[in-house]
Amino acid sequence: MSDTNKYRIEVQPMPQFIPEQSDPENDRYIFAYTITIKNIGEVPAQLVSRHWIITDGNNEVQEVRGLGVVGKQPLLQPGESFQYTSGSSLTTAIGTMKGTYQMVAEDGTHFEAEIPEFVLASPRALH
């Protein structure tokens, strides 16, 4: 069993602009994102913490760290997925998010799961 396949987590983000909660005239843009986390490795692994890097359209960077996601620290068996929805607020109509989840495998090995960069954009920001 190679370590490359042993500790593997797939992360799929799906962002969405929330117009009814946004107020563009006051530089307030609200986004929701649904994240699917799947254990594609060979051992059970628990998500223990997160690290987000959020960049707005002015290249202002905000880093967010915390335990778990939405108050949970899910333990994922091989082949199992966990999905959650959360949100972010920007002062610009476009931005990006990326980061990592800190994971601990059942055997005590610590590893990171990459959250691929995704775009947060109000519909008019892309035209």
From Swiss-Prot:
Residues 3-127 form the ApaG domain. Pfam families: DUF525. One of its GO terms (biological process) is error-free translesion synthesis. PROSITE patterns: APAG. InterPro entries: ApaG_domain, ApaG_sf, Uncharacterised_ApaG. Transmembrane segments: none annotated. It comes from the Bacteria. PANTHER family: F-BOX ONLY PROTEIN 3, POLYMERASE DELTA-INTERACTING PROTEIN 2. This is Protein ApaG. It comes from Dechloromonas aromatica (strain RCB).
